């Protein structure tokens, strides 16, 4: 391996190791931050698995290929129950993700060997590698937890001294007692049931609950870096710093930029032609990402709600999470024929940033993952939201408090929703006078998320901290 310090002539250039969790919602922001570090002349080593790196490489500009060193480490082979080529959360069923974490823990030895040989200045790591901070400390390497979660999620997590607090799903249905300001940020019961199993309690032999993973990383790191900014959630960032008694530094939201290598393919030209034919801000853009998959019942209500709303739509439909998914979902019979005059269902890949940035898009019907929220705000698109997994419920409550997006009403116990609630929510946010506040507020927040000079200053402050505290 290259020892980048050998090439550091004046001692001001850093070698930073990036070690994200095996989910694209984590690997992509880690790569985006890696690009920004490299653009300032620092060296970056990006550790992940071979297949994940191969899927990330198309996102890398050619001018950065010499300063970002991709370190391919294979997951250990064994009886880990993962499918062939299962190297990211999108590659495996939800019930097998614990085995992906066990395999990730199996990278401990090769990661240690790389750190010993390369002698970096910093390791920026994700929540899952609870075993890494003691190793970095032994080697004299500074460790930062770079959180792909926002400050509100970190502020809701259990800090030191509250080990016996919140031990059942129902305990998560109200803001925790350490939050000193008024907020509605908490889980609904149906959300608690999903996250509690893997986060607080673990039933898979050999796996470690997420609360212990993230707790070990936060306790062991020197500093917490957050993909966020003070203009969005100063109170949550301040609370996180107070709770954990160590620096909490926002790096900015890392706003996405359209792919510079993107070419006008026949696919995009077909999509663009359809969007160009529609009025400004008239289209509901529907997409639920690579992780979330609505159930058949949920998909039916979404489709029938779109139909009932009477609004034009462009739906990027994913019917299964991967080739291993043997239960694809299907649209209600006759739906596409009945809505053909005002809607398009797209079953292939689409360049999301270009689609989102199109003037015809007036609303996004989506999940409230943090990366998705950033993209929508970046292009001033208000959101109608459905929670499916992970921290999405917390993200959605923050967005609702700021009246940038609207949660489609659901039964709080079972999580079911109706076509009427979908239709009413879409019309509220997109066209009704009562929903004007959402449309105006997202424009205002775009002035923060889309202000590249402001976001660059966050990155500069982050890098200054790394250099000063190497």
Curated annotation (Swiss-Prot):
Positions of disulphide bridges: none
InterPro entries the UniProt entry points to: UDP-glycosyltransf_plant, UDP_glucos_trans
Positions annotated to bind UDP-alpha-D-glucose: 290, 350-352, 367-375, 389-392
First-tier enzyme category under EC: transferase
Keywords, sorted A to Z: Glycosyltransferase, Transferase
UniProt xrefs under Pfam families: UDPGT
EC number in record: 2.4.1.-
Top-rank taxon, per record: Eukaryota
Alphabetized GO MF terms: UDP-glucosyltransferase activity
Family note: Belongs to the UDP-glycosyltransferase family.
Annotated protein name in UniProt: UDP-glycosyltransferase 91A1
Native source organism of the sequence: Arabidopsis thaliana
